[in-house]
């Protein structure tokens, strides 16, 4: 019958209950909960106003634009913009959010010299030459140091109409690597050239050259140090905690080939490792990292073809450095003994051939 009250619907029901003696004897508790529930609401509901009798005592919050939403970083206490910060999984590769050209402070003169003397760059040591990408070792004048100059052609121009260029992504990923405290190359400058502000013609990135280093292909079958078990084991023990650190913060490398992980030192005790070529890296949400971390572990194990005991030691070092790993050590080994890739099943722990 109380639905026949003056206030129709749900309001009529509560009007009837309010008129009954003792029904809302603990009304002050309801009001306290209502204040806590609706204090961040832009508009107070009719139900809230009906019970509390107040409408404008709580200040209205300001609506924050989506582009200014911020959150706390896992690695620092300061706030960050979730769409541009290098450690945010929300960050977008849109080139309008980032500079088209960037130079480290104090490197402007050297950058101008490199751009004005392309013959000096081309005369340097050519480190790699792949499809649309060349990397040179360039010595700066007056003994100001040595840099690595990577030049990329405008390959697949439609892919970069709205997105960052290949060096632009690498510059952004190096920022994340530096924030995590992982040893890697230091970016000094990057830039790109576009036609009509849309089609990318070429781009470049300059990093400080890491002297006296070699890449991890030395430890692959046929490599210069493949038979040096002590150096190979030390190499794996050094990169495992760094990979775990990446994954703990949602950093998916996507290209953990030994050629992209340099080492320096002639003895296991003096060895250091450095990560390079991070253009393909992505930030991912933690709940999606299961498949990505398996791929990042599969890649170096497949390339190095480690003996079973060394492969298990590598996984144990990774797991010990990753307390939030979604797998137990046994589950991690089991997943990588039957890892499916391109329709084939790989056993990268025991070194069995693909099936």
Model segments located where?
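C-lobe/activation-segment region of protein kinase-like
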Residues: 271-351
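Conserved kinase catalytic-core helix
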Residues: 173-176, 180-183, 213, 219-254
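Activation-loop N-terminal segment of eukaryotic-like protein kinases
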Residues: 263-269
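Short, glycine/acidic-enriched loop or turn micro-motifs at the edges of active sites
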Residues: 211, 258, 280
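Hydrophobic residue at the +6 position relative to the catalytic HRD Asp in the kinase catalytic loop
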Residues: 256, 261-263
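Short, low-complexity, charge-dense intrinsically disordered segments
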Residues: 6, 12, 17, 29, ...
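Juxta-kinase regulatory segment immediately upstream of eukaryotic protein kinase catalytic domains
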Residues: 79-123
């Amino acid at each position: 019958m109380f639905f026949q009250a003056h206030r129709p619907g749900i309001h009529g029901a509560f009007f009837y209950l309010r008129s009954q003696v003792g029904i809302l004897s603990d009304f002050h508790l309801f009001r306290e909960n209502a204040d806590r529930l609706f204090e961040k609401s832009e508009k107070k509901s009719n139900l809230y106003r009906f019970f509390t009798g107040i409408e404008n005592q709580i200040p209205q919050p300001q609506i924050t634009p989506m582009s200014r939403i911020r959150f706390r970083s896992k690695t620092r206490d300061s706030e960050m913009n979730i769409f541009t910060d290098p450690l945010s999984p929300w960050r977008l590769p849109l080139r309008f959010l980032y500079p088209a050209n960037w130079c480290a402070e104090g490197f402007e003169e050297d950058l101008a010299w490199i751009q004005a003397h392309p013959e000096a760059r081309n005369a340097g040591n050519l480190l790699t030459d792949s499809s649309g990408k060349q990397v040179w070792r360039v010595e700066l004048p007056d003994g100001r140091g040595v840099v690595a100059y990577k030049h990329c052609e405008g390959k697949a121009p439609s892919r970069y109409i709205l997105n960052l260029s290949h060096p632009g992504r690498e510059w952004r990923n190096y920022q994340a690597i530096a924030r995590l405290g992982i040893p890697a190359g230091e970016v000094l400058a990057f830039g790109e050239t576009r036609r009509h502000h849309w089609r990318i013609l070429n781009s470049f990135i300059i990093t400080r050259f890491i002297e006296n280093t070699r890449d991890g292909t030395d430890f692959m079958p046929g490599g210069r140090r493949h038979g040096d078990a002590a150096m190979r084991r030390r190499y794996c023990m050094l990169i495992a905690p760094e990979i775990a650190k990446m994954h703990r913060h949602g950093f998916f490398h996507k290209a953990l080939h030994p050629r992209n992980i340099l080492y320096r030192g002639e003895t296991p005790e003096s060895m250091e490792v450095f990560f390079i070529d991070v253009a393909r890296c992505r930030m991912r949400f933690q709940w999606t990292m299961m498949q990505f971390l398996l791929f990042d572990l599969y890649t170096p194990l497949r390339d190095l073809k480690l003996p079973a005991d060394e492969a298990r030691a590598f996984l144990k070092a990774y797991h010990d450095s990753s307390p939030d790993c979604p797998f137990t050590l046994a589950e991690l080994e089991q997943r990588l003994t039957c890892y499916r890739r391109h329709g084939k099943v790989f056993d990268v722990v025991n070194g069995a051939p693909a099936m």
